[in-house]
Curated annotation (Swiss-Prot):
UniProt keyword Chaperone, yes or no: no
Protein name: Matrix protein 1
Keywords on record: Host nucleus, Membrane, RNA-binding, Viral matrix protein, Virion
Localization terms from the record: Virion membrane; Host nucleus
UniProt region (RNP-binding), positions on chain: 165-252
Region called Membrane-binding, residue ranges: 1-164
Record-level GO cellular component terms: host cell nucleus; membrane; virion membrane
Gene name tied to this protein: M
Length: 252
């Protein structure tokens, strides 16, 4: 796996699923391929994206700044600086300075990542802030190692939270989660079907599913009534794909 592929993998692991994630993935691919060289426009686009947490925007802004060539006098962006200040906690800043001193002596991506993984996400973000604000300089490889370690820390906590939700025995949470997944699947079906003339049937199924979820929420239904909703939708989607000559069995 190449260095940039690894960086893209880690960064995308902390972005919530949805159309925006696909858009960000495309921007990262373009940046890493040298196709997008307007850092100012890229940062303005990132700043106005909805849904993303300030820290995720800060990390993406840091990656774009590391990768896209820019004029030396280009101003640092406030939204990135604020996200990478470790919540203003002096303990985070102290640890970030110690980490920076270690990273300065490191030259490899994996070496930097190993060192950084023993620090908290707050200290890692603060260390990125030091580098972003030009208060410290490390090689691009080392900076990418720091980025990936930070993303791994964040993804670990997100995974723990997701696992807790999936494993919950609370029927109301499970019911709502199934309806959210069904609604998201229906939206994806509508997007996939939208570019085809034979899509009327798939669009109809997706539309009915979304109306059903809305009705279930409006009137309040038994928690078991949502069981199998998403799987039924996916079966419809795969039937439609087979008719279109597309063989994708990876959704479940």
């Amino acid at each position: 796996m190449s260095l940039l592929t690894e960086v893209e993998t880690y960064v995308l692991s902390i972005v919530p699923s949805g159309p925006l994630k696909a858009e960000i993935a495309q921007r990262l691919e373009d940046v890493f391929a040298g196709k997008n060289t307007d850092l100012e426009a890229l940062m303005e686009w990132l700043k106005t994206r909805p849904i993303l947490s300030p820290l995720t925007k800060g990390i993406l802004g840091f990656v774009f700044t590391l990768t896209v060539p820019s004029e030396r006098g280009l101003q640092r962006r406030r939204f990135v600086q604020n996200a990478l200040n470790g919540n203003g906690d002096p303990n985070n800043m102290d640890r970030a300075v110690k980490l920076y001193r270690k990273l300065k002596r490191e030259i490899t991506f994996h070496g930097a990542k190993e060192i950084a993984l023993s620090y908290s996400a707050g200290a890692l973000a603060s260390c990125m802030g030091l580098i972003y604000n030009r208060m410290g300089a490390v090689t691009t490889e080392v900076a990418f190692g720091l980025v990936c370690a930070t993303c791994e820390q964040i993804a670990d906590s997100q995974h723990r939270s997701l696992r807790q939700m999936v494993a919950t025995t609370n029927p109301l949470i499970r019911h709502e989660n199934r309806m959210v997944l069904a609604s998201t699947t229906a939206k994806a079906m509508e997007q996939m079907a939208g570019s085809s003339e034979q899509a009327a049937e798939a669009m109809e199924v997706a539309s009915q599913a979304r109306q059903m979820v809305q009705a279930m929420r409006a009137i309040g239904t038994h928690p078991s009534s949502s069981a199998g909703l998403k799987d039924d939708l996916l079966e419809n989607l795969q039937t439609y794909q087979k008719r279109m000559g597309v063989q994708m069995q990876r959704f479940k």
